[in-house]
Amino acid sequence: MSSGVQGGPAANANAYQTHPLRDAASALGTLSPQAYVDVVSAAQRNFLERMSQLASEQCDAQPAAHDARLDDRPALRAPQERDAPPLGASDTGSRASGAAKLTELLGVLMSVISASSLDELKQRSDIWNQMSKAAQDNLSRLSDAFQRATDEAKAAADAAEQAAAAAKQAGADAKAADAAVDAAQKRYDDAVKQGLPDDRLQSLKAALEQARQQAGDAHGRADALQADATKKLDAASALATQARACEQQVDDAVNQATQQYGASASLRTPQSPRLSGAAELTAVLGKLQELISSGNVKELESKQKLFTEMQAKREAELQKKSDEYQAQVKKAEEMQKTMGCIGKIVGWVITAVSFAAAAFTGGASLALAAVGLALAVGDEISRATTGVSFMDKLMQPVMDAILKPLMEMISSLITKALVACGVDQQKAELAGAILGAVVTGVALVAAAFVGASAVKAVASKVIDAMAGQLTKLMDSAIGKMLVQLIEKFSEKSGLQALGSRTATAMTRMRRAIGVEAKEDGMLLANRFEKAGTVMNVGNQVSQAAGGIVVGVERAKAMGLLADVKEAMYDIKLLGDLLKQAVDAFAEHNRVLAQLMQQMSDAGEMQTSTGKLILRNARAV
């Protein structure tokens, strides 16, 4: 009891709690299968070595009084009779014999273990040699097949080359035969023209037929040889393809053998330690995350490249459409300016014609010319000050009531005729509008020269409409301002004096050219008036045609502007798609990171639980 008290807790401890292999045994549950096998094998070797060592000590030295055991535990002996000799008094021979037997047993055991290891190594070596021989035989077989295919392909290529040479020679012979036929035909034709005797013609004809027969035979041989050459060439191509396939098989077999029997062969290297289930699953998920992340990165890069290329193309198209739009707008502006200049020039020419007519009609025509000049000057002043042309407003009822319906009717008829002939609807309408304006102008000019009553009626309508519009214009604020401007302009520029001087000059010019009679003056005045009417109508027609052309150019410009806006929308859409791709990439990575974090937390929790269980088990 005293010894137990003095020893403290160590004296009362269980023998298994103080055993030196306790920690190693506790660690067995956390080892991998391969590490477990290594630990058990090492323990067996240490046990056998210890047994051999103790047996040798007992054989060489005197036995101890306490008869020590191999596991350092006290030996238990059966009770003996008092008359029996003590166990220590037994002769040494028996002990030595027992130790020798134990040593012999251990030697046999080690030899068996070594023999089993050697047998296993031999079996693996045999397997390795067999596999190597099989791979070598396979490579030899594939190499022989490749060599045969190469030889056959080479022979077929040589045969095809020879056949091609023969076909070429046959073709040359056929050409020579054709030349002979042409020569025979020429000799026969010359003989016919020269009127040679019939027997001579018959011989030449027979020679011609023979040449034709030989040429036909030569062409037949050439075609046959060419077909044979083509066939052999196809066969050579097929054999070459087969040889390439054999070469690919040899390369694949060599690569497979290199991978299987190289430095990383599983039969020559020990197996890597296997992971536990959770660790292996975590490793697999990590690899999966790596693959998915790599795929997402590649997908994002491909989408970014695609969207960038599409944006660049759309920007180039947008720039092109913008340049075309600017060109169309500029063209329309230039056309409008050109037609405006033409209209102004024609207007001033008409004014000049009116002044010329004044020389032959006297004061009335001169007054009308002065009014025309005043209206022209007033129109320019009004356009410069207010930006509005009252002459355009005066001519608008004429265009709406007379010229425009006539132009629309003619244009409709021309359009229907063009559509019936198969012309496109849009092109037919454009051509009809232009031709309608031209035909209307020509008709009015012709009618003006003829002086028909219908034109007089139209002219009366035009005069009534213009008179009404002129009355309204004069009553309006613009008309009053125009009258004031004209009066001021007359006072400042001396238009009245200019009018009187012009009348005197016109009278002198009328007398100078010999127009004394009133009828002659009226005739010339009528002619000048017709010329002015024709030019005025031509001016209106040209202005209408110019307006149509300007409208067409503006329509094209509007179409280009629509294309520009569509391209801008496409660029914005591509930017939105690229942004969505980036957001999807970030979302995928976030989900994968969250999944791996959850797996890591689960593994950490499992490890902590295992450690806690082992710690509690050790305390038992």
From Swiss-Prot:
Family per record: Belongs to the SctE/SipB/YopB family.
A GO cellular component entry from the record: host cell membrane
Chief subcellular location: secreted
Transmembrane segments: 355-375, 401-421, 430-450
Name listed for the protein in its UniProt record: Translocator protein BipB
Ranges for region Disordered: 58-95
Annotated function: Plays a role in the bacterium-induced formation of multinucleated giant cell (MNGC), which is formed after host cell fusion, as well as in the intercellular spreading of bacteria and in the induction of apoptosis in macrophages. May act in concert with other effector proteins to induce fusion of host cell membranes.
The keyword Transmembrane is assigned to this record: yes
Record carries keyword Coiled coil: yes
InterPro entries, per the entry: BipB-like_C, IpaB/BipB/SctE_N, T3SS_SctE/BipB
